[in-house]
Curated annotation (Swiss-Prot):
Organism: Chlorobaculum tepidum (strain ATCC 49652 / DSM 12025 / NBRC 103806 / TLS) (Chlorobium tepidum)
GO CC field: plasma membrane; proton-transporting ATP synthase complex
GO molecular function: ATP binding; proton-transporting ATP synthase activity, rotational mechanism
Record GO biological process: proton motive force-driven plasma membrane ATP synthesis
Transmembrane segments: none
SUPFAM superfamilies cross-referenced by the UniProt entry: ATP synthase (F1-ATPase), gamma subunit
Gene3D superfamilies, per database record: 3.40.1380.10, ATP synthase, gamma subunit, helix hairpin domain
PANTHER family: ATP SYNTHASE GAMMA CHAIN, ATP SYNTHASE SUBUNIT GAMMA, MITOCHONDRIAL
Record protein name field: ATP synthase gamma chain
InterPro entries: ATP_synth_F1_ATPase_gsu (IPR035968), ATP_synth_F1_gsu (IPR000131), ATP_synth_F1_gsu_CS (IPR023632)
Subunit (UniProt): F-type ATPases have 2 components, CF(1) - the catalytic core - and CF(0) - the membrane proton channel. CF(1) has five subunits: alpha(3), beta(3), gamma(1), delta(1), epsilon(1). CF(0) has three main subunits: a, b and c.
Function: Produces ATP from ADP in the presence of a proton gradient across the membrane. The gamma chain is believed to be important in regulating ATPase activity and the flow of protons through the CF(0) complex.
Principal place of residence: membrane
Topology in the lipid bilayer: Peripheral membrane protein
Amino acid sequence: MPTLKDIRIRLKGVKSTQQVTKAMKMVAAAKLRRAQDRAIQARPYAGKLKEMLASLSTKVDTSVNPLLSPREEVNNVLVILVTSDRGLCGGFNANIIKMAQRLIHEEYAALHAKGGVTMICAGTKGTEFFRKRGYKLAAAYPGVFQNLSFDSAREIADKASKMYLSGEVDRVVLVYNEFKSVLAPNLRTEQLLPITPEGGDAKTASSEYLYEPSPAAIIDELVPKHLNTQLWRVMLESNAAEQAARMAAMDSATENAKELIRVLNISYNRARQAAITKELSEIVAGADALKQ
């Protein structure tokens, strides 16, 4: 049975931890508000670019731009994984890493066996995990979320584009956490390259837009912007989802600490009561011995 001193030391440690988790929850909540605003603000612009590409794709042949042209055979795949730089965010990183592993070892198992799967990892946690296990990394961006900027997204998009254009890879897939709500993160995989715009409609394309100088020229300008914007949106979504996961994890840790403190206080009082009872028993026994 633990002594009073042992329980006091443990109580002190749990209370100290509770203060830390409570502070981290408050910091995560403040960061979440900012990250959520940025993610939500990026969605309309990214969506409109995708809509414009969908409309333009009905006016030209996809062969006008190599980033729109699917390959006849997919022999090499690039997986872009977005994780966080820091931990203490529940299952945020573990879940998305498991999803990336399932994608590689199930959907692309045959390609992976032949060395046909390459990765780009954005975020320290994913970089460390896959680098330690010997996965083929074309590039890694640990610490990218320490100072998140559009330039970082553009750098990753440029790297992926060059690999696709050079024929080094035949498909580029994104794996990331999409922000839905504090309690409902959404694990996502989506194809980045070749670009496959959806929702293009010849009727709306001709009635809503006039293209100058030509649809093909506009596509050449829009495609790089689309890729940069999609990577930026994904990183903002992941950042918001990370802060939401951290806030929820720290809230749970704070509540668990509160419950543990309650249990330890009960144990402390019981141990203290037992010690007092023992001392009284010894005093009474000593008094009886003196009388005899």
